[in-house]
A protein has these predicted regions:
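Assembly/oligomerization scaffold segments
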Residues: 1-89, 178-183
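Short, acidic/charged, Gly/Pro-enriched secondary-structure junctions
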Residues: 1-8, 37-68, 98-110, 257-280, ...
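Extracytoplasmic
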Residues: 17, 30-32, 58, 72-74, ...
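Short, basic/aromatic beta-hairpin or loop at an interaction surface
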Residues: 18-32, 234-250
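Short solvent-exposed strand/turn elements
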Residues: 40, 74-90, 293-313
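Short, conserved beta-turn/loop elements at beta-strand boundaries and strand-helix junctions
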Residues: 66-71, 285-293
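Charged- and aromatic-enriched interaction segments used to assemble
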Residues: 73-186, 345-350
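Acidic, small/polar-enriched beta strand-loop surface segments
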Residues: 139, 152-244, 251-291, 303-309, ...
């Protein structure tokens, strides 16, 4: 493991590691570094960690756990990058006409996290966030922007800063069965299928079905798998319903020679004729394994580049409905005051 170095609070260590695993995934998973080593203890909980390979710094994080085995000299620790703090902290917020970048900076500011590269703001956001994680709150802001421009956003940590990146960018990697793929697998499932969305609207406390968006072919072939969504003003409800449809889920795994460019959220090229995996695929998760003098990657592929989304309750509408009911009750009380007790109001009105 000559090419591999780990810095603990700035101090360099090498040639003591028996196994190092560097991993990550799309959809809000912080990148993780797991290390096994021999010799004296080199870490404490909370220590700053930098991991480099071939003098390229790949991971910045903090030690969350360390351990040792009494019968051997083997010690171990694992660390997460800074994005873990977005998952580990919940907030009570109420945003009104705020830009996504303002929401991002507010959450990161409270967590003492730096903000790195972010896209240009195209929308404003109004929503309450009660007992929601920092990740969910930021994700919801960029989901609102996604509904307008259809770009797919991911929240990642790069060099200790929180970046908002466009998911699916192609990286210069080609995996082939002839050169660098050891094993591969492919499967299909309808476990999470959604082939019809019912769009409804609540008006005067009555529900009204407005539209149905369907995948007719999947309905005919597999039966009905239905979900509902509430109509929203000023958004393309049909397009959003189409986004919710889920067809046959395809998944694939590749075990290949290591390459640091293979990371979750990026697309890579694959030519593997035995499983039919030929083309460009999004990396859903990646696990890089360094052991002895070997370096391999275990990759899960995604067949659709879709935005991670979280459902927030629309408290605004609930409040409006409560106010309407309160006004009606108040008006009724005032009319009742005009009539003495025991009078027949209907008869009097005639």
């Amino acid at each position: 493991m000559e090419k591999l170095k780990i810095y603990v609070n700035g101090k360099e260590y090498k040639n003591i590691f028996t196994r190092v695993i560097w991993s990550g995934a799309i959809y809000g998973t912080a990148r993780k570094l797991e290390v096994e080593y021999l010799g004296d203890i080199i870490t404490n909980i909370g220590d700053e960690i930098i991991f480099s390979y071939e003098d390229e710094k790949l991971f910045y994080g903090k030690v969350f756990q360390h351990s040792r085995k009494g019968e051997t000299e083997l010690k171990s620790f694992y660390a997460y990058d800074n994005s873990i703090y977005l998952n580990k902290n919940n907030f009570v917020k109420n945003f009104f006409k705020k830009k996504p970048s303002e929401i991002l900076k507010e959450i990161c500011g409270e967590l003492n996290l730096k903000v790195g590269k972010i896209p240009q703001d195209e929308v404003t956001c109004t929503y309450p966030a009660i007992d929601r994680s920092g990740y969910e709150i930021i994700l919801n802001a960029y989901t609102i922007q996604h509904r307008k421009n259809k770009k797919i956003y991911s929240i990642v940590s790069n060099e200790q800063a929180i970046d908002i990146v466009e998911q699916g960018t192609y990286t210069d990697v080609l995996l082939t069965s002839a050169d660098n793929i050891s094993t591969s697998s492919y499967e299909e499932s309808i476990e999470n299928m959604i082939n019809q969305i019912v769009i409804y609207k609540v008006e005067k406390e009555k529900q009204q079905i407005l539209y149905k968006v369907e995948n007719a072919e999947d309905k005919k072939k597999f039966g009905l798998f239905q979900q509902v969504m509430e109509y929203e003003k000023d958004v393309d409800n049909i397009a959003n319903a189409k986004d919710m449809l889920k067809s046959v889920e395809k998944s694939a795994r590749i075990y290949c020679l290591g390459n640091i460019l293979i990371q979750a959220g990026y697309s890579i090229g694959i030519q593997e004729p035995h499983t039919g995996l030929i083309g460009s695929f999004l990396v859903k998760s990646d696990t890089h394994i360094f052991e002895g003098e070997t370096y391999f990657c275990n990759i899960e592929l995604a067949f659709e580049n879709v935005m991670d989304k979280v459902q927030f309750e629309n408290k605004e509408k609930a409040k409006k409905n409560k106010k309407k009911r309160a006004k009606k009750a108040k008006k009724k009380d005032k009319i009742d005051e005009l009539f003495p007790e025991g009078w027949d109001k209907k008869k009097w009105a005639n």
